[in-house]
Amino acid sequence: MNLAAMDPLTYDVQLEAKRVKLKQLFTDFDTPELESFSSETAHYRMRAEFRMWHEGEDLYYYMFDKELNSKVRCDQFLPASELINKMMPVLVELLKPNTILRHRLFQIDFLSTLSGEILVSLLYHKQLDAEWEEQAKILKQTLSSQFNVNLIGRARKQKLIFDKDFVVESLNVAGKQLQYHQIENSFTQPNGKVSVKMLEWAIDVTKNSTGDLLELYCGNGNFSIALAQNFERVLATELAKPSVESAQYNIKMNHVDNLQIIRMSAEDFTDAMAKKRSYRRLEGIDLDSYNCNTIFVDPPRAGLDENTVKLVQGYERIVYISCNPNTLLDNLKELSKTHNITRFVLFDQFPYTDHMESGVFLEKK
């Protein structure tokens, strides 16, 4: 992390540099005008992780600055949500005099929401005993006088929860209130307000759709739930078990009755669609009954593998969100043979870094 780059006064210049870089990267393609969605310049990250440094009686958060090649003390952290910044000094002052809770504590993770919940995970290089558990309960009770907080203690093969290991985020998306169960230690979009802009963009590009939607890599149902209003039915796949459980929770919480989640990888689903293999997890699901004209993909940094690209090319419309423009570029070399790029977008999920969250909407030629 380059802490020196985190200057709100230079934010607009840094965002424009990303816009220029992204447009240059895709010059070989016939792309429409680049849309871009900016971030807040401070307090935009809903989660943060800090290592802990012990120095005599002192105890403080730190991060490693790659530019300086050294650790940097972080009493406050500009990118983190206001709630995390409010919690940081209160928590560390309670930990400093507590020899049981601070002993062998090496990391603290925070997960917060725009709706005011915060989850704190304390990570240790020791086993957590009954004495630690008693002190953790007191800590949670003390923090609860100021915060809507839950607490987790983690050590090797241990996870102690006081009282929940998740938060519930509430987002206003295109005038509709959506709730999302976000579990500790699983993927969620880090920038809450930009995540809303991503959902609204996806709703907009698919607003006149017909038939059904297929989503690969659906996570906790973040996009599927928001997009269900635009389709007759939605079929979504996700491999990670905690994310699938969150997705099922979110379906019920948001009263979505036209969304089916399947726990399997995109690669296995591709084989199932091609009738190469049959899977027990698909028993009772008639894939042929779905009339999916649109496919939504938000793959890992590695992008889509060759077989999944071929699967995706079979759909009339493709919504592709990417956390790695280089792998999106590689995938578009094939996808552009069969589809036109009709929308092109940059979401600044990660201000003050080189990371770019981008997206395209493609329609069959």
Swiss-Prot record:
It is an enzyme of class 2 (transferase). It comes from the Bacteria. This is tRNA/tmRNA (uracil-C(5))-methyltransferase. It holds the Pfam family tRNA_U5-meth_tr. GO terms for biological process: tRNA methylation. The keyword tRNA processing applies. GO terms for molecular function: rRNA binding; tRNA (uracil(54)-C5)-methyltransferase activity, S-adenosyl methionine-dependent; tRNA binding. Belongs to the class I-like SAM-binding methyltransferase superfamily. RNA M5U methyltransferase family. TrmA subfamily. The lineage of its organism: Bacteria, Pseudomonadati, Pseudomonadota, Gammaproteobacteria, Alteromonadales. One of its GO terms (cellular component) is cytosol. Dual-specificity methyltransferase that catalyzes the formation of 5-methyluridine at position 54 (m5U54) in all tRNAs, and that of position 341 (m5U341) in tmRNA (transfer-mRNA). Transmembrane segments: none annotated. Keywords: Methyltransferase, S-adenosyl-L-methionine, Transferase, tRNA processing. The active site is at C323 (nucleophile), E357 (proton acceptor). It comes from Shewanella piezotolerans (strain WP3 / JCM 13877). S-adenosyl-L-methionine binds at Q189, Y217, N222, E238, D298. It catalyses: uridine(54) in tRNA + S-adenosyl-L-methionine = 5-methyluridine(54) in tRNA + S-adenosyl-L-homocysteine + H(+); uridine(341) in tmRNA + S-adenosyl-L-methionine = 5-methyluridine(341) in tmRNA + S-adenosyl-L-homocysteine + H(+). The keyword Chaperone does not apply. InterPro entries: MeTrfase_TrmA_AS, MeTrfase_TrmA_CS, SAM-dependent_MTases_sf, TrmA_MeTrfase, U5_MeTrfase_fam. Its EC number is 2.1.1.-, 2.1.1.35.
